[in-house]
Design a protein with these regions (language model features):
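Small-residue-enriched hydrophobic alpha-helices in membranes
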Residues: 2-209, 213-402
Length: 402
């Protein structure tokens, strides 16, 4: 039965971003050449060796070439590089993780490189020769499985101030991964009494229960999550129905344990930390935050518990907070909740709080003109929260979060 219900793992924010990139930019694989002159925007990957103090390392050189159309002359840009593992097909991309935090997505360990590219000199510019935009050491990349992997690299140019995408291209590249992948590590773990998905459900239920009771909105969200997981992994038919039935049964068990006061949240998080891959752990954290967000309220004891759970799962605090900003309600008026969402620590003095709020303001203000409507809406909500925090917290000598 565990073989039937184990579902395809998706890295909540990271994979969504990679899949969105693949969806927005289909068919932009390379460019075309007419009369020896390249038209369109293109990218490619070149393997090479880079010397180091200790010898050398294998790297992947990412290059771009071709036509770039900007809104105006001297339009300042950033370059972004994303990588997806499409060995199972472009309709089933899996995230490529990165061990270097500088090249990770804001809210997950999935690879994402963003660097300043500089101004585009004219509205229409053509790179006649290949230009290198990044060199990625192979050793920092973590793939789903060992062996030959088919990778999709997506290179895009975005406005530095407004986030507008002005050029994009993708290319496919085969890479042989000699090390176990993050899903291989999951498969070789000792057999668990419950599959990873059961532990995820127990963790979310345990965090959200109040005196043994889970709000109906949370239970509904968890049941929808079960169906979604099965639909992503299993073709329609008896096996999918069996997987849904199995996981719903385990959720009912978790609800009974919560009612009896016997649902061990910390112990469940520790089991996930031991048995689950990093992808599973981020997915578990994302499910917990979605469940808490479904309540439309974040209570003080729960924010403490959330940070403790993140620590037990081995998730970076700042990445967890970025995930929380996407999932948790923004209409809070509690000082404790504002501090949690905006990264204000009790030990900060007034100057440090103002600096933290300024950093958050700069980050979100840069997104108010983003081409993605969902990001614009989130930016508006965050800026409203920051304004309230400034009026209530910035000049206080201390902030008591209790």
């Amino acid at each position: 039965m565990p073989d039937v219900i184990l579902v395809l793992v998706f890295l909540l924010a990271g994979l969504l971003c990679v899949r969105a990139a693949a969806g927005r930019w289909p068919g932009l694989v390379g460019g075309t050449v007419e009369g020896g002159r390249r038209t369109g925007f293109a990218c490619r990957v070149e393997p090479t060796v880079m010397p180091t103090d200790d010898g050398s390392v294998e790297v992947l050189a990412i290059q771009m070439c071709g036509r770039i159309q900007a809104p105006r002359n001297r339009y300042d840009t950033n370059v972004q590089v994303l990588i997806a593992d499409v060995t199972e097909g472009t309709n089933h991309p899996q995230p490529v993780l990165c061990t270097d935090e500088a090249w990770q997505m804001e809210d997950s360990p999935a690879f994402c490189l963003v660097a300043h590219n500089g101004p585009i000199p004219r509205r229409v510019a053509v790179l006649a020769n290949w230009v290198q935009v990044a060199t990625i050491p192979c050793g920092v990349l973590v793939f789903p499985h060992r062996g030959v992997r088919r990778l999709q690299f997506v290179v895009s140019l975005h406005g530095r101030r407004d986030g507008r995408m002005i050029a994009s291209a993708s290319t496919l590249y085969s890479f042989t991964n000699p090390k176990p992948g993050y899903l291989d590590e999951r498969e070789v773990q000792p057999s668990s009494p419950q599959p990873i998905e059961v532990l995820m459900l127990r963790l979310a239920a345990g965090v959200c229960q109040n005196d043994g009771v889970l709000p109906d909105a949370v239970v509904s969200l968890l049941r929808d999550w079960i169906v979604s997981q099965a639909e992503q992994a299993i073709a329609e038919g008896p096996e999918r129905d069996a997987a849904v039935q199995y996981l719903e049964g385990r959720l009912d068990e978790a609800l009974s344990l919560a009612q009896a006061g016997r649902l061990d949240v910390d112990g469940t998080a520790d089991k996930l930390a031991r048995q689950a891959s990093i992808v599973d752990r981020y997915q578990a954290a994302g499910l917990v935050l979605q469940a808490v967000g479904a309540e439309q309220a974040v209570l003080r004891h729960r924010t403490d518990r959330l940070m403790r759970i993140a620590g037990r799962l081995g998730i970076d605090r700042e990445k967890f907070r970025a995930m929380a900003q996407k999932c948790l309600p923004m209409h809070t008026h509690r000082v404790e909740d504002m501090c949690f969402l905006l990264g204000i620590e009790p030990k900060m003095d007034a100057d440090e709080r103002r600096q933290q709020l300024n950093q958050e303001y700069q980050k979100w203000n840069a997104r108010v003109t983003h081409p993605d409507a969902a990001i614009r809406q989130q930016a508006d909500r965050m800026l409203t929260l920051i304004a309230e925090a400034r009026s209530r917290l910035a000049d206080e000598p201390t902030v008591v979060q209790a």
